[in-house]
Amino acid sequence: MKRFLSLGAIALAAAALTGCGLLEEDSTDAESEVSGDQVDAAAEAASGDCLPQEVLSEDPDVFTIDCSDPEAYWSITAIDGDTDATAAAGDLTDYQPAFDLCGEEVGAFLPGKPLTDWNMIYDQVSGEVDYLFCVEAIAEPDEEGRTAVVPAAGDCFSSADATWSTVPCDSELADYSVADVVELELTEHAAADLEAAATECGETVYYELTDLFGRTSALLCVE
């Protein structure tokens, strides 16, 4: 039976930053299909193991990669091969198993904190989830100085990036700096409430830190 990798929360939520999704129109199942060897290797995966940014390695024989590999982007924080979770159309039918395994803040954009996400290996036909796992971005800058950490006050970022990260403020990539952060309860907020909170930013531009689940953790007041 074929197994597939979920599209993942971070990939879908990235549209909030750029206005366009990471998923190309010509994406195919082949791009997320997990080989039999990778499924077997996932059985040996454990907290602290690393994965590439795309989660699925190009090498069909391995699931995790060496954490010293320049391609290492995610660190596994938890993995469960005995879950009652089910999937449909590349997504969990109920997110509660992900919250139970990864914590309620998984996928949330929290200022000053590394990106987090969940993912799964599942059977596209039966919907059975073989492995559900949680990941946290490795907070180390890449060759361009980009670090997979949500910007906080004093940080700079590029609005052209596919998802939240920080860049050095003297980098040519930086086009915004965070002047202030308006912290909010991590939940869904009505538009009127967000507009009211945004008055704390004064006349400056602001960004909403809203995740896949519709929860907004804060507003970034930028200049």
Predicted regions and their residues:
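C-terminal motif of bacterial Sec signal peptides marking the signal peptidase cleavage site
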Residues: 16-19
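Primary mode marks residue(s) on the alpha4-beta5-alpha5 output face of response regulator receiver
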Residues: 21-223
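Bacterial N-terminal signal peptides that target proteins for export
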Residues: 1-9
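Hydrophobic helical h-region of N-terminal Sec-dependent signal peptides
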Residues: 10-14
